[in-house]
UniProtKB/Swiss-Prot annotation:
It comes from Xanthomonas campestris pv. campestris (strain ATCC 33913 / DSM 3586 / NCPPB 528 / LMG 568 / P 25). This is Ribosomal protein L11 methyltransferase. It is found in: Cytoplasm. The lineage of its organism: Bacteria, Pseudomonadati, Pseudomonadota, Gammaproteobacteria, Lysobacterales. SUPFAM superfamilies: S-adenosyl-L-methionine-dependent methyltransferases. It comes from the Bacteria. HAMAP family: Methyltr_PrmA (MF_00735). Keywords: Cytoplasm, Methyltransferase, S-adenosyl-L-methionine, Transferase.
Amino acid sequence: MPFLELTLPCTRATQPRFENALEDVGALAVTMLDAHAGTINERAILEPGVGEVRLWEETELTALFDGDSDPLMLLAALEAFDPSLDTRHATFRSVEDSAWERAWIDQFKPMRFGARTFIVPWNQDLPEEANTPDAAVVRLDPGLAFGSGTHQTTALCLRWLDALAGEGQLQGCSVLDFGCGSGILALAALKLGAANAVGVDYDPQALLATAENAERNAMEAQMQVYLPQDEPVQTYPVVLANILATALDALAETLAARVAPGGRIALSGIMQGQEQDLVQRYTPWFEHLHCEYDAEWVRIDGVRRH
């Protein structure tokens, strides 16, 4: 079934009102893009602060509605919800569901990380190499695009977990995945032998994605999810944080306090050029800090001082 796509230009100041109005009138999804994307005025927003949402000064909002929605009635409903909204520059077009949904699903293929860790879309067959008793297979819903293993930051963490399991460091332990997204790292740790895992994220939708993927992998009893303010304060033998450098810097004391003495930590989401400042930041709490590189991305791992 096709969808009706509505595109609206707005500013940083008016974006929240537009987004609320779109959701109120039945938008199935709302996305935000730089209004100058693809031009010399395009501006990247790579590093929001912890719990912060940053927007462009001029933003393009795109909303999807059921294909049988009436454009004129939608505009009237938006203006009725908030008469101050300027909808004069709204545009509509019909979008086939396969044009966006299938494109993402089709590019998500089974992937291997390290010796025995596999990430496989739930709707695809296991590759032959994953049909072994010791394979650690995580099934993910490719529609939950909070982390699928395709990005280097996630791949760096998955390879680290696989190596850790090979050393016997994961067996029977508890794992904290801070910034859990889809839950891919926590679930991989469980598949590799961890006894239980906790996923923490600022985004409630990420917690929902993690819980759904845990259920899909029959691991809901071993997986707990929390918003940061609700997380029980405890220590873990293994902690992962695949977020961004600014957040890793701001959360250094918090993350260090979560790692048990002698425990292991992996930090990812770091771009080349940012790693040395973070190594220095974490040195008071960790030793044997090591940087692993994949293209322009870096993972830092280390051992908690006693």
